[in-house]
From Swiss-Prot:
Oligomer with a subunit composition of (alpha,beta,gamma)6. Keywords: Cytoplasm, Phosphoprotein. This is Citrate lyase acyl carrier protein. It is found in: Cytoplasm. Belongs to the CitD family. HAMAP family: CitD. The modification O-(phosphoribosyl dephospho-coenzyme A)serine is found at residue 14. The keyword Cytoplasm applies. The keyword Phosphoprotein applies. Covalent carrier of the coenzyme of citrate lyase. One of its GO terms (cellular component) is cytoplasm.
C-alpha cells in the first residue's frame, strides 16, 4: 500500500490513541505513550504487524497513546491507513 496523503484516526481521550500518518520515503514510527515503559515494545509489535498486513513500506507514523487496548490501537491504525491511500483495497488481506 502506498501512502499518498496525510490522515488521522482516533482521539487524545483516556484509553484511546491518535494516529497520524503522512507520506514519506522511509519508514518512521514515533510512539508517545503514557504506558511506554510497560507496553512500548508491544505497541511497536502491533504497529509493525498491521503495517506488514497492509504491505506498507514507507510512511511517517506518529502515535499518541493514552492507554488504548491493543484492539483499539490496531483499529485506529487500520482506519488511518485506509484514509491515507487512494489504492483499491484487497479486503481479504485486511479482514
Amino acid at each position: 500500500m502506498q501512502i499518498t496523503k496525510t490522515a488521522v484516526a482516533g482521539t487524545l481521550e483516556s484509553s484511546d490513541v491518535q494516529i497520524r500518518i503522512a507520506p514519506s520515503t522511509t519508514m518512521d514510527i514515533e510512539i508517545n505513550s503514557s504506558v511506554a515503559k510497560q507496553f512500548g515494545e508491544d505497541i511497536l509489535n502491533s504497529v509493525t504487524a498491521v503495517l506488514a498486513q497492509f504491505e506498507v513500506s514507507s510512511a511517517q507514523i506518529i502515535i499518541e497513546d493514552k492507554g488504548a487496548l491493543d484492539c483499539v490501537l490496531r483499529a485506529r491504525l487500520k482506519a488511518a491507513l485506509l484514509r491515507a491511500t487512494d489504492e483499491a483495497l484487497a479486503w481479504e488481506k485486511i479482514l
